[in-house]
Amino acid sequence: MQDSVDLENNLPEAKELLTEENLKLELSHSGLREIAWIFNDKEIFTEENIQALQLHPKPMVLSETIILLHKIGILNQQNLKIVLSHSELEIVNLMLNTLQEVGIFNQESFEKALSHQKLKPLKLSLYYLQEAGMLTQENFEHVLSEQEITPIALSLRYFQEAGMLTQENFEHVLRHREPVCIVFSLRYFQET
């Protein structure tokens, strides 16, 4: 009986401990345990790396990205530093997951994707190509080579929304001297 009284008396204190912030902290620490195991396996378990993980503003996204790099077999100190310092980690994570889903994620595609100047339009382009079943190594290379990728991404979006994203239409967009004109045309037809 005494135990139940003590439990009831301490219940408000226990409820105070179970806050959203504490729950997030516990989840991030459990993710950190898995990452620490991976780091140990890859011989990159250092105080500096663990501290960088703990202080990162987006620990869950960082953990997912590290696990993905490990899964693909390209987790090393150099790639870890790139990921830790990247300002658009959420976009990087989504893009790498897209590449991994279609089987074209490797060290080379990692370096090419992360060195691209416009990550958000690149991620969107890859997403729409994947949705249409057209994300191949060749199409990935085509998208990477484009200087003006934003109109490409928008064109792919409008073609996808209209159910007309085909390899032929994709190649037409790539060949067009002013892909932004395609965007305006597709948008006009979509609105009418």
Region roles according to the model:
Residues 1-192:
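Ankyrin repeat (ANK) tandem alpha-helical domains that serve as protein-protein interaction scaffolds
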